[in-house]
């Protein structure tokens, strides 16, 4: 089972990692944040990647090319793991930054979960 690189288990592991962060957080993600709170490059790049999800789905449906979704989920996984390593969520500098990062983690989890399910793959909460 290869949890590194461009594999299905890598995407599943990334989903499980996001679930773990959300479980360890003392509060649930908030629905509203100040977008200006996210300042790091890894945060910005992950937000931009997540914004592409509706367009990726439209492309998959219009072109009948499911590999577009698999490539996208791998990119999201790479960006999430960069964010995870560069942007502490639990133990962030202040509560506003922690809340913003926690919401970004939850949004990433949603995209990975939905993408995996669309491909007929499990989205495990633990690995």
Which residues are covered by each model-predicted region?
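Non-catalytic interaction-recognition regions
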Residues: 1-127
